[in-house]
Amino acid sequence: MATASEERAAADVLKSLARHLNCLNEDNKIARKRALEALKRETVEQRLSGGALQELFGGLLKALLKCLSDPAETCRDTAIQILTGFIRAVPRPEDSLPYLMPALAQRLGGKEILEPAEELRLALMETLSLVLEVCGRQLAPYLEDMIKILQRTITDPFPEVKKESCKCVISVAQSIPDHFHLQAESLLKPLLQTISHQHSQVRVSVTQATGAVIQHSTGKNVDDVLSHLAQRLFDDSPRVRKAVTVVVGDWLLRLPDRYSYFHKLIPLLLSSLSDEIPEIRTLAEDLWKKIGSQWEKENEDDLKDKMDFRLPAPALYTSGVERPGLGCRELVVRNLSKLLPAVGRDIGDWLVQTRVKTAQLLRVLLLHAEDHCTQHLQSLLTVLYHACADPETDVRAQCLESAKLLGAFVSAEVYLKLLLPHVEDFTSCSSASPWAPLTVLGAILRGSSREALQPHLIKIGDTLAHPEVCQGSQQALYLDQLLVCVDAVLCVCQVDCAVISLQLLKVLVSVQSLASQQEQRNKAEESVRCLCEAQGLSGACELYRQHMADLLQWLSDSHHTWTSHSIQKTQLEIIAMQSGPVVGEFLPALLPLLKSCLEPSRDPEMRLHIFTMLSKLLLDASNTLDSQGGFAEYMEMVLQDLLLPNLVWRSGRSAAAVRTAALSCLLAVLHGAVLSVEETLSTQLISALEEDSKLARLLACRSLHSLLKLTTQRLNTDSLNKIYPELLKRVDDSSEDVRVEALKSLSTWFSCLGKNYDTQSCRPHLEFLFQQLLLYMDDPDTKIQDLRLPIILCQCVLVHSHTQYCSETLHTP
């Protein structure tokens, strides 16, 4: 109550202001403006006592509120300033509420906002904030007016008004919570309409206001709000994400019905644990610890045994990561069955950022669930199959980390029972990517311990070496994941891998056979070296020596079905080439396999591939097939069973290519072997001189050349007389290389004319030969003239001393 002196002072001031009050009704806005400024000077700007100001405020309030509707913006502005000054200074501002609140509601809370000036709307909202601050609970009777105002101003076009409105929402909720919950829900619609505003600070304010509304409401609208808050976790502004984290954390700590919403709120807070901003991560960690501790205290009776006998962290617990508290872990475990379906749905969302956030959340959930993951393993594997095939690198990386956690927390026997059938037949799982189960297997193996995997190594090795797995696809991604699985087993189990050395080698050979990229083949070869190191072997040769018999038997089991499309032919090549000298130790097993594959009735393209491999081996025979010096024992078999049957002429381009390849092998044999089948061989080579292929004719000439060198003076007269006419034909060949090689072969042919060659009876042959050779002395190609003809003639003279033939031939017209 004002004292008598304060009342007199107020009355005196009011008398002095009577003229100014009358001027407020003037038509001239300047006069009204001056009157308001005079009121301001004589009241709120004077150092009057609180009681006197209270009396003045009561006397001037209606006039000032009327000025809020003044046509002049400057007058309305001054009136608001005077009102604000009185509210801040008077001891009982609540006395003004019966008139002030309806006036504000009329100005701001109607269907149409009457105040056109955005700065004045902001000033009015600041006045309302001040009223909430100084009046508090005494505003309860005016809640409806405030709700009307806020419903309109939250969606105001002016961002500053939006922010001030959100501030008022929080103040109302905290000032009169007992009444606010009755009307709180009516504010959610305008708030959610504004939560995606372009200004980040507006989004922050709306998020905070939404948190207050839900906190002090009946809690029925949490579901309506969650999706909007979840979207704000992807906000580009760290301040917005921080606000969401604080709001959700506060709900988990204080929301009256929070237990009903744990499964919906926990994912939002845990998502912030993976935020890119350290401050937000730290904030989320602190809130999560508080939530876990509070829940632990609230449920002490249920957790008594676990609290009294706390189990240590799993042995393979992620290094550098603090283990969550018991309360946090239990909260996740008890809600995991409700969380995983949503995770499985969102991991396939069309938005990349949603998939990344979900993948990060999955890892955090598994870190909390620990061995409780086991009961959800099937659904977890399904989620991981999809996620590990995601085109986004971040999604795949997070899911691989999740798979490693499964390896650390789940028994190997359990996850292998579910996972290996999917590896053998990827169509049995829901993934469209054949490499997805392999990807998950590789990551889980990486997360497992050596002791856990050791009893199951044979099962793992057999699965990886199964034809449907190691030969299941030529896709680069599939082969990469096969290598990842092999490397994971080698890395974790090390020397224990000796029991599945053969299976792993089969996988690595298969990868090299299917790989279309040299980089993949190099990786596979590196894995072979790692396999050797794991067993203490000196190199790949030792590894192949250990398993060559089994590898050849592995290939022999299916060789009758090989075609040009069979991977086995390439596997054979890799084994033979990479084993080096070891292949020479297993000729009894290798050559029958080659014989079967090179039968003329088999696929021509497949035979061509085998001949190409054989040619490479023969060219380096001392370090491959003949490394033990025993290849000569099998030479006749090689010629009779492998080469000669394939030199027989057959129609078709494929058959011609096979004959060319066989000639290439024959030439390699002739370069380093002694033969006992020269008669048969020379017949086949003579036939090959007529091939359509230039390369085949060239190889045939070279082979005859080598054969003549190897069988010097051992060929009978008939064989020699059959050879030279065919060589003479090749001197007229369209290919210069073939002509040159034919002349070289003829030169060697002369050296084969030993004592058994009857020059008298064969005189017509010699005369014909010399006559034909002399024709080439005038060949337009000087290389042909100069190359071998003089040498041939001289050899005839020196070796056989039949000068009369030379002289007669030279003088024959």
Predicted regions, residues:
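Extended, low-complexity, acidic/polar intrinsically disordered regions
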Residues: 1-813
